[in-house]
Structure formats: C-alpha cells, structure tokens
C-alpha cells in the first residue's frame, strides 16, 4: 500500500503515518511547517519530507490513498491534484474507521477526560495481554506511538474528538468512527467557532449516542446533569451510567475501594476517579472482570500533561496539565486542592484556544479558579491577533473570572519573573495550558522552581 499524507506534521497525522510505516506501507507526506516532536519522530522512521511546503508532483496515480489533515486548506495544491486524479481521499478519522470497521470499536468522547480514559483502557488491555489497536491524543509511558493498526487485533480503542473531521468534511470526528461501545465523559460547551450554541454542541453527543448498535453500550457520566438528561433519551442500546468510584486518601495516596479490598493509585482527583469508572465499565464490556481491571490500573501513571508531576521536593511540587476549558480548569484545581489540603496552591493557566480567547466564552470561567490560594491567568496578545479575534484586555479577564485578587499577565517574561519570586515553602504550583505560555519549557521551569530552593 502506498499512502501520502497532506499535513503530515500534525499530532495525530504524524502518529498515523508512523503506524502505517511500521505496518509496512510506503509512506510519504508534506507540510508547510513541522516542529518537534513530530519532526524528530518522522525523521527516525525515514518519512520526514525533504522539503517544507506543498508539492503537487508528489501526488501520483499509483497512490492507494491520500490522507488529509485538518491543517490543510480546501485550496491546497496537493489536495486539488488528488481530486483531479480521482484518488481516494480520506481524513484521518475516515482512514482509522476504514482500518477498524471489522473490529469492536471503543470510542471515548466527551468535553474532558477523553485522553485519560482512552489511555486507561489501553493500559489495562495491554497489562492483561489482550491485543488491541488504538488512537490516543497524548504520549503514553511505554508506548512508542499514539496510533497502532494491526491485522490481528479484534478491538480498537479510539479517542473521539468532537471537532471537525477535515477541511472538506464538517462532521465531528467521533461520528465517523461508528462506535460499538461509546463513552461520554461530560458535556461542557467548547469549539464555539464550530458549534455556535450550546444546544448545537449537545446535539453532536446525542447523534454519537444514537449511532451505537443494539448489542453495544453507551457508558456515560451521570454526575453531569446534561449527560443524565441525554442518557434518558437514548433507547437504541444498553445504557451504563457511572459516577465517582469509591475511594479514600491516606498519606497522600488515593486508594480505590472495592468491598473489603483497596487498591493504591498513582494518580489522583475526583475527575480521575470518574474516568476510572468509565474505563472499568468499558473493560467489563470487553470481557474483563473488575479484579483484572484493578490489578492493572494500579500501575497506570497517567497520560502526558494530564496532572503530570514535573518536579517535587519536601517543600514544593510542580504539576502540568492540559486543562484549558472552564470545566477542566475547575476539576484539575479541585483535584490538587484535595490531594494537598495543607499546602498553598498556586494555579497558573493560559488562555490559548480559540474559544477561551473569545469575549463571549470568557464568561464561562466565572469562579473556575476559586479553590486556588493564588490564581494567575496568562494570554498572548499575539495569539489573539493570529486567530483574527477582537483584542482581549486584562479588565475583561478580571471580570470574567470574578476573582478580585486574580493576577493577569500578557508578557511571558513577567509571568516567569513573578513565579520565580514567589515563596514556595509548603506549596504546589499547577501549570495549565494546551500551549506552553509562549515558549516556556515547562519541565525545565518546574525543576528550576523546585530545586533552586532545595
């Protein structure tokens, strides 16, 4: 099989390209920009494009498939050439479905927790030596790539994003996967540039749930009021609601309770205890017992940038997290607050996504950082301009978060200076962003904060 990727540098795209290369396909690709880690990983597998940019001459009649990334535009010269030649053009969700249509597909949807739940299921299946294919949105410890496609696995576990499939396909990605077992972790309005109303956003999850066959399962979080109402409207498949798994915290370690037994975890937070229940029900649906699930989950360390410990001493700990939406922000701060009740909690987040930099959506952040002792918000005026959005002013952020002592920064150097000058005695720093605060190496910065005081 000969496959070409248009926009090979994307997170999901380059992982799919590597997965197909591992499978023995002949893989080529193009992009107008490729950064690390994608650049280094593509080079390692011998599929990094020789030249940056679009090259229509790479689109030849002998290609079996052209896979189109979201980064490419409708007028992309390679896409136009592929159409002209009548080649089979797939988005990466379409191609994943094509490769898994004869398998049991576990699709994890929801506004938050998708990556973690997907990672948990994959971890448990691997631990129990159950062959599975997968696509997950973050790097996992012990896994070389975020996508695996094989001819042997009977199950595929897919992180199902609700964002658009491709520039020429306006369907949400998770609709394309046709779930056998569908999980919805929660509904909190996002991607307002695509789903202009909350009702329109919720509708996408209902469509997803109604795609599940009669012999499948819908696993959904009943702690979420909107999801509870949605669940009551679903009659086409078996419904499995879940909530927070019973637990207790002792000496800074969270334990799962199962009758008389308890299991120590390497992760924490009520949101993760809900994620665990979702993963447990999915594994049950695939034939695993609770005991097999618990035996495996105790060694799960979490996905990259999901409450990931950067550095720690007896005095101070630094975590980084992907949290950026209001619901994720609140859940992540609350998790750290519960885990470290006697420490000063400094929460620092970046407004980075299209939605979060929109004045209308900003109002959703009211009281999201109330559980932190110190709250800081960073945004980049250049990012606002790049996204062609109206200018954001610090006063708008103060008003939106409804916190009088909120500290707002729009200069990365000043933010770093403020954090480095903070007294970190008996404290925890939580850095939250889907970006990197305009070029901060979060690992190095976290270590600097912890070990400069050691």
Residue ranges of each PLM-predicted region?
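ATP-dependent carboxylate-amine ligase
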Residues: 1-34, 42-49, 62-66, 82-87, ...
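Fold-independent oxyanion-binding glycine-rich loops
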Residues: 8-9, 30-31, 69-71, 92-93, ...
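Short N-terminal binding/cap micro-motifs at the start of the first secondary-structure element
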Residues: 12-15, 36-37, 142-143, 274
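Phosphate-binding loop of NTP-binding sites
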Residues: 19-23, 57-61, 70, 74-220, ...
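Short, charged/polar "capping" segments at the starts of alpha-helices
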Residues: 34-39, 57-58, 73-76, 142-143, ...
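Beta-strand->loop->alpha-helix junctions that form or flank phosphate-binding loops
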Residues: 51-54, 90-97, 135-138, 234-251, ...
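Short polybasic amphipathic segments
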Residues: 253-258
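Short pre-catalytic strand/loop immediately N-terminal to key active-site residues, enriched for Gly-Thr
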Residues: 263-268, 316-320
């Amino acid at each position: 099989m000969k496959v070409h990727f248009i926009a090979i540098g994307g997170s999901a795209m380059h992982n799919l390209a590597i997965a197909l290369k591992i499978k023995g396909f002949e893989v080529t690709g193009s992009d107008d920009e490729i950064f690390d880690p994608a650049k280094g990983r593509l080079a390692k597998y011998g599929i990094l494009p020789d030249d940056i940019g679009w090259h229509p001459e790479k689109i030849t009649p002998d290609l079996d498939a052209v896979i189109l990334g979201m980064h490419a535009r409708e007028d992309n010269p390679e896409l136009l050439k592929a159409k002209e030649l009548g080649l089979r053009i797939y988005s990466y969700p379409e191609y994943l479905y094509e490769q898994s249509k004869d398998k049991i597909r576990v699709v994890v949807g929801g506004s938050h927790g998708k990556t973690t739940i997907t990672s948990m299921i994959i971890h448990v299946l691997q631990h129990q030596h159950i062959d599975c294919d997968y696509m997950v949105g973050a790097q996992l410890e012990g896994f070389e790539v975020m996508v695996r496609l094989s001819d042997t696995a009977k199950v595929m576990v897919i992180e199902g994003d609700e964002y658009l499939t491709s520039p020429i396909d306006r369907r949400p990605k998770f609709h394309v996967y046709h779930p056998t077992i569908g999980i919805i972790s929660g509904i909190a309005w996002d991607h307002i540039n695509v789903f202009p109303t909350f009702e329109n956003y919720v509708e996408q999850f209902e469509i997803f749930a109604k795609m599940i066959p009669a012999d499948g399962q819908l696993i959904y979080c009943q702690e979420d009021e909107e999801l509870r109402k949605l669940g009551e409207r679903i009659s086409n498949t078996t419904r499995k609601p879940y909530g927070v798994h019973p637990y207790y915290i002792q000496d800074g370690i969270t334990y799962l309770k199962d009758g008389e037994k308890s299991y120590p975890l390497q992760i924490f937070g009520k949101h993760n205890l809900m994620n665990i229940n979702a993963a447990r029900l999915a594994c049950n649906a695939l034939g695993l017992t609770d005991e097999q699930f618990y035996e495996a989950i105790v060694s799960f360390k979490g996905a990259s940038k999901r409450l990931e410990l950067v550095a720690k001493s007896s005095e101070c700990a630094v975590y980084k997290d992907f949290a950026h939406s209001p619901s994720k922000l609140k859940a992540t701060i609350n998790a750290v607050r519960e885990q470290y009740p006697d420490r000063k909690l400094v929460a620092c987040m970046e407004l980075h996504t299209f939605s979060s930099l929109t004045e209308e959506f900003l109002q959703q952040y009211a009281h999201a950082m109330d559980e932190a002792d110190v709250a800081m918000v960073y945004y980049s005026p250049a990012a606002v301009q790049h996204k062609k959005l109206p200018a954001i002013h610090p006063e708008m952020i103060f008003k939106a978060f409804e916190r009088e002592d909120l500290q707002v920064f729009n200069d990365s150097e000043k933010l770093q200076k403020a954090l480095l000058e903070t007294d970190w005695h008996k404290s925890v720093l939580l850095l939250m962003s889907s970006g990197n605060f305009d070029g901060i190496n979060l690992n190095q910065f976290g270590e600097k904060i912890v070990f400069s005081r050691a």
